[in-house]
Amino acid sequence: MNKLRSSAITQGVQRSPNRSMLRAVGFNDEDFNKPIIGVANGYSTITPCNMGLNKLALKAEESIKRSGGMPQMFGTITVSDGISMGTEGMKYSLVSREVIADSIETACNAQSMDGVLAIGGCDKNMPGAMIAIARMNIPSIFIYGGTIKPGKLYGEDLTVVSAFEAVGQLTSGKITEERLIQVEKNCIPGAGSCGGMFTANTMSAVIEVLGLSLPHSSTMAAEDLEKELSADKSAEILVSAIKKDIRPLDLMTKKAFENAISVIMAIGGSTNAVLHILAIANTAGIDININDFERIRQKVPVICDLKPSGKYVTVDLHKAGGIPQVMKILLNAGLIHGDCKNIEGKTISEYLQNIPDKPPTNQNVIRDIHDPLYKKGHLAILKGNLASEGSVAKISGVKNPVLTGPAKIFESEEDCLKSILNNDIKAGDVVVIRNEGPVGGPGMREMLAPTSAIVGQGLGEKVALITDGRFSGGTYGLVVGHIAPEAAVGGNIALIKEGDLITVDAVKQLIEVNLSDEELKKRKKDWVKPIQKYKRGILSKYSRIVSTSSLGAVTDL
């Protein structure tokens, strides 16, 4: 084992005052020669995603001690995307990714910690922790709080998206208010992150593929015993990694990020993975850009039938073999790199050695590579005169991802949702929600409420929705987000007028408004930059420093 970083606060006569403080929190003489390991605990009762984390943190703490380390627990924040969705509060969601990253980096570096075990549940916990881990490059491991089990109503599996869609179903007369309340009361049965292949489960899978969490751990249910056992094992592995000096940037290679992109395509993951992978890779100093997603999408099929557009939930994926089974199928097809290593020092080829070559025959969640749901990945990168830097379209569940129609312009999510619920949106429309980007929102809110209402009204195949904001992992339909440049910085999405014809063509990777360059230039001359909405506080700071979404909406370029 190399010299411990914590020796800066534990060794030598001059560090006697430092040691006195450590003795007060439980250190004894022999402990000053042990690695000090931060336990970044995202426990919170704000959200079901994080309410089960404390037991995992305590289990990990015990395991660190038993394995020869000294744990020091500290808290990180979380917000609940599901609770803040559709409100002003959602502007703080993406901002919280940076706060989480900054807080973990601050605590670990201020206290000269030798390693960190991060525990998270809700969407931004995972990328926030990974950004911090990449910045510090000290031995690290991530423990995912686990997925929620599906709710049940009359034999049907429910998720939180069921409740969002029920709102649209109610306003279009498809269900009664009584049914809406039944869905509301039954869709979230306990602890864990939203149960489909939404953002939290997508990002936990990304971390598993990158090698910074244990195999199979990203799809475990939050309330199952194996999740606690996995936390115990993760802590033990981290202590070993410190002794072996295995560091995050040893694992976060370009090949590893390509593997992660391949897996999110195969499992039908969230559009948010594009934003977060770009941010993590940027921090790690790895050259991954938005075009890599399109390149990989062209060759990797969707082989998992998972919600929101599919049938099954993440616990079903776990029973079918989890992420290792998906990876083994992709490895055999030559679609991922087998020489990338994980936190245990094993290559992908090594730790997948005992995974079956084909998915189990008694399940329908994971398909064979030759019988995919879709022959190409579902996250398409679209460019054109509305998105010269790129945009992200999610096209799973859409039979024909091509639509040309008149623009219906909204300057906020709230105005759009009101119009949808008033049945003002018709088949063939292209709904435009702008000034919701990283700078303009600020915070790049997720448009789950409008998209779910559209689907609930039966228009998911007949209407396109485009925005410089984001989408929840629970969104599906013909949707295009992350449009860059965004409206607030003068992107062409700011120049569209009501009724302009817009084409969304995921087959040709095209998004454009039917206007000449001359007309766009003329409109740009008349464009007035919006007044900054916030003068003080975190949203004001964020809007001044955040990058474009095509670079991951990072704050430390």
Swiss-Prot record:
InterPro entries: DHAD_IlvD/Edd, Dihydro-acid_dehy_C, DihydroxyA_deHydtase, DiOHA_6PGluconate_deHydtase_CS, ILV_EDD_C, ILV_EDD_N, IlvD/EDD_N
UniProt cross-references to Pfam families, sorted A to Z: ILV_EDD_C, ILVD_EDD_N
PROSITE patterns, alphabetized: ILVD_EDD_1, ILVD_EDD_2
Cofactor: how bound: Binds 1 [2Fe-2S] cluster per subunit. This cluster acts as a Lewis acid cofactor.
Residue list for modification N6-carboxylysine: K124
BP GO terms, sorted: isoleucine biosynthetic process; L-valine biosynthetic process
Positions that bind [2Fe-2S] cluster: C49, C122, C194
Reactions accelerated catalytically: (2R)-2,3-dihydroxy-3-methylbutanoate = 3-methyl-2-oxobutanoate + H2O; (2R,3R)-2,3-dihydroxy-3-methylpentanoate = (S)-3-methyl-2-oxopentanoate + H2O
UniProt keyword Iron present: yes
EC number: 4.2.1.9
Active site: residue positions: S472 (proton acceptor)
Pathway it works in: Amino-acid biosynthesis; L-isoleucine biosynthesis; L-isoleucine from 2-oxobutanoate: step 3/4; Amino-acid biosynthesis; L-valine biosynthesis; L-valine from pyruvate: step 3/4
Keywords for this protein: 2Fe-2S, Amino-acid biosynthesis, Branched-chain amino acid biosynthesis, Iron, Iron-sulfur, Lyase, Magnesium, Metal-binding
Keyword Iron part of the UniProt annotation: yes
PANTHER family xref list: DIHYDROXY-ACID DEHYDRATASE DAD, DIHYDROXY-ACID DEHYDRATASE, MITOCHONDRIAL
Entry function: Functions in the biosynthesis of branched-chain amino acids. Catalyzes the dehydration of (2R,3R)-2,3-dihydroxy-3-methylpentanoate (2,3-dihydroxy-3-methylvalerate) into 2-oxo-3-methylpentanoate (2-oxo-3-methylvalerate) and of (2R)-2,3-dihydroxy-3-methylbutanoate (2,3-dihydroxyisovalerate) into 2-oxo-3-methylbutanoate (2-oxoisovalerate), the penultimate precursor to L-isoleucine and L-valine, respectively.
Family statement: Belongs to the IlvD/Edd family.
Quaternary structure annotation from Swiss-Prot or TrEMBL: Homodimer.
Protein name: Dihydroxy-acid dehydratase
Protein species of origin: Prochlorococcus marinus (strain MIT 9301)
